[in-house]
């Protein structure tokens, strides 16, 4: 009985209370606007903090991209309630050019092959778009285009290396909440892995666009796929048509 009484006391005064204690916002790397929007429970806060701590340990053993202060860069450009388009990526570029925004790279880095194909589709469908000589997509993010990788870090030279450390539950939570709380949004899901996230999105109020990934590997593949090719998918035109119909204002895709 004494042992059971101690167990009950520990459960009430230690373990339960520990779960109720949250984590300071700065330790979650997220801006206050996003912390307010996500309303992470104390348990979820601790879970996210554990993933961040895990990545910090991995950084002592190998080079990890992007730098910690860039991991949540996708959340810095606009109020979450102002997001109009969500473009999902997989994990960051693993060659040192990742800047925290899916598909984007900082000025001074070559335009990656997948982004070149994105530019090609933009030019095909929107003749006023001229492919720039850089890969910085900050201008899109500032207009309400959320460029979110589903995995937020990667080891140098090893794509997919951080797929199982715990980022996916967090980005799934972000996607689900955006679907729940936004009135109308365009979700662009390119490739099979991004397409799997369609189940998190309410397609009755949002426009969900899927196609193959813009990578040259996917575009040059001769294997049959249920998804249409990226080039020719018309997603950027369809997105602006939807936004205009909803009275939200179009995205200026020019860079």
UniProtKB/Swiss-Prot annotation:
PROSITE patterns: U_DNA_GLYCOSYLASE. Signal peptide: none annotated. GO terms for biological process: base-excision repair, AP site formation via deaminated base removal. Its EC number is 3.2.2.27. CDD domains: UDG-F1-like (cd10027). GO terms for molecular function: uracil DNA N-glycosylase activity. This is Uracil-DNA glycosylase. It is found in: Host nucleus. Pfam families: UDG. Keywords: DNA damage, DNA repair, Host nucleus, Hydrolase. Excises uracil residues from the DNA which can arise as a result of misincorporation of dUMP residues by DNA polymerase or deamination of cytosines. Therefore may reduce deleterious uracil incorporation into the viral genome, particularly in terminally differentiated cells which lack DNA repair enzymes. It catalyses: Hydrolyzes single-stranded DNA or mismatched double-stranded DNA and polynucleotides, releasing free uracil. The active site is at residue 91. Belongs to the uracil-DNA glycosylase (UDG) superfamily. UNG family. GO terms for cellular component: host cell nucleus. Coiled coil: none annotated. It comes from the Viruses. HAMAP family: UDG (MF_00148). Its main location: host cell.
């Amino acid at each position: 009985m004494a042992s059971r009484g101690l167990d009950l006391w520990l459960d009430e005064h230690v373990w339960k209370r520990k779960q109720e204690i949250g984590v300071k916002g700065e330790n979650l790397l997220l801006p206050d606007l996003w912390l307010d929007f996500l309303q992470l429970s104390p348990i979820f806060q601790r879970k996210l903090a554990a993933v961040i701590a895990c990545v910090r340990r991995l950084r002592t053993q190998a080079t990890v991209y992007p730098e910690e202060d860039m991991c949540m860069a996708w959340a810095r450009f606009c109020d979450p309630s102002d997001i109009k388009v969500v473009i999902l990526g997989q994990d960051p570029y693993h060659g040192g050019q990742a800047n925290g925004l899916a598909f984007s790279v900082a000025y001074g880095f070559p335009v990656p092959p997948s982004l070149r194909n994105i530019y090609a589709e933009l030019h095909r469908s929107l003749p006023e778009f001229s492919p720039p000589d850089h890969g910085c997509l900050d201008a899109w993010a500032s207009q309400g285009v959320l460029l979110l990788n589903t995995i937020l870090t990667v080891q140098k030279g090893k794509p997919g290396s951080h797929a199982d450390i715990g980022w996916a539950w967090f980005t799934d939570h972000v996607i689900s909440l955006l679907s729940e709380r936004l009135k109308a949004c365009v979700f662009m899901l390119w490739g099979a892995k991004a397409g799997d996230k369609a189940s998190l999105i309410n397609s009755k109020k949002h426009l969900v666009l899927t196609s193959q990934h813009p990578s040259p590997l996917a575009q040059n593949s001769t294997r049959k796929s249920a998804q249409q090719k990226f080039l020719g998918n018309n997603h950027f035109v369809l997105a602006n048509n939807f936004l205009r119909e909803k009275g939200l204002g179009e995205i200026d895709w020019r860079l």
